[in-house]
Amino acid sequence: MFRASLLCCLVLLAGVWADNKYDSESGDDCPTLPTSLPHMLHELRAAFSRVKTFFQMKDQLDNMLLDGSLLEDFKGYLGCQALSEMIQFYLEEVMPQAENHSTDQEKDKVNSLGEKLKTLRVRLRRCHRFLPCENKSKAVEQVKSAFSKLQEKGVYKAMSEFDIFINYIEAYMTTKMKN
């Protein structure tokens, strides 16, 4: 009888512990994200600075891939979707091509940048108030279309403008933290 009671208590405590752990990792309030965000953006910028010169030297185009309409989407009601789609775009389309067009020395740096972006995405997804989105962003579609039309040059353009993307992330997050 004592063993059964003890086992029941242990199962109950394990369930409570797991539930609390789940709530703290995936809860809507995410109290640590606003304080850790500047550090994550700093890490993204530092990782980008290691490949910035390489890609900007290869970018021979004068036009901008990431323009003001994308920033407006980030700041507006489509901010969540624009951010989510742009992170996905960089992770699934730009970064793999950037690695393929990099020297062996640059590949590890591009991979590190991608890992930091993945970490940011995971943290934002856990914090539902920062990525609660459903709609599509026309500005992101324009970026993707322009990127595709540029073919190989699109990789250099997108990577050379990664710092602009980080600034847009920061603008979006600043807006969300004020709400």
From Swiss-Prot:
Q: State the family it belongs to.
A: Belongs to the IL-10 family.
S-S pairs: C30-C127, C80-C133
Which PANTHER family does its entry note?
INTERLEUKIN-10, INTERLEUKIN-19-RELATED
Give the UniProt keywords, A-Z.
Cytokine, Disulfide bond, Evasion of host immunity by viral interleukin-like protein, Glycoprotein, Host-virus interaction, Secreted, Signal, Viral immunoevasion
Q: Does the keyword Nucleotide-binding apply?
A: no
The scientific name of the source species is Equine herpesvirus 2 (strain 86/87) (EHV-2)
The reply on keyword Transit peptide is: no
For this entry, the protein name equals: Viral interleukin-10 homolog
Name where it mostly resides.
secreted
Purpose of the protein: Down-regulates the expression of the TAP1 gene (transporter associated with antigen processing), thereby affecting the transport of peptides into the endoplasmic reticulum and subsequent peptide loading by MHC class I molecules. In consequence, infected cells are masked for immune recognition by cytotoxic T-lymphocytes.
Where in the sequence is the signal peptide annotated? Answer: 1-18
Where in the cell? Secreted
Q: Please spell out the taxonomic lineage of the organism that makes this protein.
A: Viruses, Duplodnaviria, Heunggongvirae, Peploviricota, Herviviricetes
Q: Which residues are glycosylated?
A: N100, N135
Q: Which GO terms describe its cellular component?
A: extracellular space
Q: One of this protein's GO BP terms? A: regulation of cytokine production
Recorded hits in InterPro entries, A to Z, give: 4_helix_cytokine-like_core, IL-10, IL-10/19/20/24/26, IL-10_CS
Q: Which GO terms describe its molecular function?
A: cytokine activity
Origin superkingdom: Viruses
Q: Name one Pfam family in it.
A: IL10
